[in-house]
């Protein structure tokens, strides 16, 4: 008789399962006999230990596995018979009341996948982002590359300004007491690069070699050094050297230093344009994709399985803990990481995953082999040996699967853009690249 699956609420279901004690014992005895053929028991030759002795040593573990297996098969038959897709793992509780002596009974509580209704794509409003790379952006990038390769020359009597490398001694105290990391000698940094706190850089600006300055500095509340975060320190700095950054000329030697083998400056500029156009394209596509996915999630109204959300939350908690370990945080394993901090985003991710999966199935948006290869070849252009990168990805199934997932998302985005109400938005290059 097919077990009856009961609907509790929303996606939650319950079913009663039963297995025969006789069937369990029959399988247990069969497994014990198999173990007996090779079991090594002190005082007995291999395979000659009494079955009763093996029952005492191996029986409980074998019986546990057999019951789990038989209950698992009974559960699969029940949900298959009811044509249900189970989300996560069931919770099993033993039943004792009203159960015959020759039966083991359990109640399985579980969740099912929802019926995912893909929203009307023509009713969605999304934004397609674009940007333009002009000669000005190429020159701006060239200037950044020059600054990265600047030679610093000490200047007597020069007042420190942005772009200069300042070498100084500093010592800080809080309430008159020195603190860890608050003192250094001959410490170099380039003004204007944001390596130091803004108040520290502001204090150093305008000083010349040999000059000293005392100033207060309040550490931000979210400063990474927790022992000083939110507190005000008094710093004393003494400048030892101010060095002006001398930018290299844009010539053949400079072009060669950036990998342009022929030393051709115009070809270097063309390479720079190609690279920043590729990066700008990736960023605008990323913004467009985010707009599409946000619109899908906002319109996707259905329950999501709590089991899937909880699983995603736990994955994110574990990832956060691994990041703490990599940063060298002491006792990272015991640092409290509140799971509820990830709950909203995890629910969004699960909802989006279900929507995308259903949309791919309905519109047949699976990644085609030629699309995957084209994406790999495009990605490989970021490397010096693109052919090797292509071979590297094509030779490994898991790496190909990573690219297939990206292509699949691209297909979904394009499908939505083809049907939705699309607004075009130009993004200034500086803003797009985080330079504004």
From Swiss-Prot:
Gene3D superfamilies cross-referenced by the UniProt entry: 3.10.50.40, Trigger factor ribosome-binding domain, Trigger factor, C-terminal domain
Biological process according to GO: 'de novo' cotranslational protein folding; cell division; chaperone-mediated protein folding; protein transport; protein unfolding
Keyword vocabulary terms for this entry: Cell cycle, Cell division, Chaperone, Cytoplasm, Isomerase, Rotamase
GO cellular component: cytoplasm
Family: Belongs to the FKBP-type PPIase family. Tig subfamily.
Domain-related comment: Consists of 3 domains; the N-terminus binds the ribosome, the middle domain has PPIase activity, while the C-terminus has intrinsic chaperone activity on its own.
Name assigned to this protein: Trigger factor
Source organism (scientific name): Bordetella petrii (strain ATCC BAA-461 / DSM 12804 / CCUG 43448)
Gene responsible for this protein: tig
């Amino acid at each position: 008789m097919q077990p009856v699956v009961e609907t509790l609420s929303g996606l939650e279901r319950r079913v009663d399962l039963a297995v025969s004690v006789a069937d369990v014992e029959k399988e247990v005895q069969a497994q014990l006999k198999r173990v007996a053929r090779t079991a090594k028991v002190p005082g007995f030759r291999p395979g000659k230990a009494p079955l009763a002795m093996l029952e005492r040593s191996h029986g409980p573990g074998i019986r546990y596995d057999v019951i789990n297996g038989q209950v698992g098969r009974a559960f699969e038959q029940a949900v298959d018979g009811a044509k249900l897709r189970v989300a996560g793992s069931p919770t099993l509780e033993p039943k004792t009341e009203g159960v015959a002596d020759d039966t083991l009974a359990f109640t399985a509580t579980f969740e099912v996948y929802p019926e995912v209704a893909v929203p009307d794509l023509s009713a969605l409003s999304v934004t397609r982002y674009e940007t333009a790379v002009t000669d000005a952006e190429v020159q701006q990038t060239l200037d950044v590359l020059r600054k990265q390769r600047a030679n610093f020359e000490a200047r007597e009597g020069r007042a420190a300004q942005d772009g200069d490398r300042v070498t100084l001694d500093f010592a800080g105290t809080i309430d008159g007491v020195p603190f860890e990391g608050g003192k250094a000698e001959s410490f170099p940094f380039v003004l204007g690069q944001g390596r130091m706190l803004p108040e520290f850089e502001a204090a150093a600006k305008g000083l010349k070699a040999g000059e000293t300055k005392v100033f207060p500095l309040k550490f931000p509340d979210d400063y990474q050094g927790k022992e000083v975060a939110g507190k005000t320190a008094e710093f004393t700095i003494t400048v030892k050297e101010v060095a002006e950054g001398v930018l290299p000329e844009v010539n053949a030697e400079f072009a060669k230093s950036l990998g342009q083998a022929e030393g051709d400056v115009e070809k270097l500029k063309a390479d720079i344009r190609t690279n920043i156009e590729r990066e700008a394209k990736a960023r605008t596509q990323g913004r467009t994709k985010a707009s599409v996915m946000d619109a899908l999630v906002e319109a996707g109204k259905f329950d999501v399985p709590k089991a899937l959300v909880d699983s995603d939350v736990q994955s994110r908690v574990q990832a956060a803990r691994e990041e703490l370990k990599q940063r060298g945080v002491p006792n990272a394993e015991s640092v409290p990481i509140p799971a509820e901090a990830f709950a909203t985003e995890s629910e969004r991710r699960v909802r989006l995953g279900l929507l995308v999966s259903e949309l791919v199935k309905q519109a047949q948006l699976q990644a085609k082999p030629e699309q995957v290869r084209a994406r790999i070849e495009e990605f490989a252009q970021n490397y010096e040996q693109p052919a090797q990168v292509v071979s590297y990805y094509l030779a490994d199934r898991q790496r190909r699967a990573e690219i297939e997932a990206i292509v699949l998302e691209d297909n979904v985005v394009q499908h939505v853009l083809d049907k939705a109400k699309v607004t075009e938005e130009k993004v200034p290059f500086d803003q797009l690249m985080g330079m504004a």
